[in-house]
A protein has these predicted regions:
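Acetyl-CoA-dependent GNAT
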Residues: 4, 8-92, 103-105, 109, ...
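Generic detector of contiguous secondary-structure segments
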Residues: 6-14, 115-124
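C-terminal "cap" of GNAT-fold acetyltransferases
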Residues: 20-23, 116-119, 123-136, 142-161
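Conserved glycine-rich acetyl-CoA-binding loop
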Residues: 64, 77-78, 90-104, 111-113, ...
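A generic, residue-level signal for flexible/boundary positions that often mark functional hotspots
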Residues: 3, 83, 120, 138-139
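Glycine-centered loop/turn positions within well-structured domains
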Residues: 15, 96, 155
Length: 161
């Protein structure tokens, strides 16, 4: 994608990125209870990621928001562990390396924050993302960690940073 940039989220991005996240969950049939689809914080990501040791990155192409991803210190995770959260890309932005680029930004930021491990929660419906996570070095866990409240996610993965 030409003229693509990754930048920190801004307050004015809230509505667009929330719409993208929900659109993608509908696209994959993953718009179910216990996911970010129904999580009220999805509408306020700028505010959510103003918390200490958290960051959210927006992917923009030709001046249009096409996705994003973040790092969050989810309560209840083991010491030194953060969560990779809300990695979503519009169909037009997939398959071009942008998802990996977003994750690499998150990895660097997590290391900068002092984290040594990164956890994520996902669903089988998001099969494209699962392949990306596997290629990035995430391995499967037998159960969930932390207290994200996303009981609709039934796949859990971890990566050493």
């Amino acid at each position: 994608m030409n003229n693509t940039c990754i930048r920190p989220i801004r307050a004015e991005d809230n509505q667009a990125i929330a719409a993208i996240i929900r659109q993608i969950l509908i696209e994959f049939g993953a718009n179910k209870p216990g996911t970010v689809y129904y999580d009220p914080t999805t509408d306020h990501l700028f505010e959510l990621f103003s918390a200490d040791r958290s960051a959210y990155f927006i992917a923009e192409s030709e001046g249009k928001i096409v996705g994003g991803s973040g790092v969050f210190p989810t309560p209840g995770l083991p010491e030194g562990c953060c969560e990779l959260v809300k990695l979503y890309l519009l169909a037009e932005a997939r398959g071009k390396g942008l998802g990996l680029h977003l994750m690499e930004n998150c990895f660097r930021k997590a290391i900068e924050f002092g984290f040594t491990d990164m956890y994520l929660e996902t669903m089988p419906e998001l099969r494209n993302a699962i392949g990306l996570y596997e290629r990035a070095g995430f391995t499967y866990l037998p159960g969930s960690l932390g207290k994200s409240g996303h009981f609709g996610c039934d796949l859990w993965m971890m990566k050493k940073l």
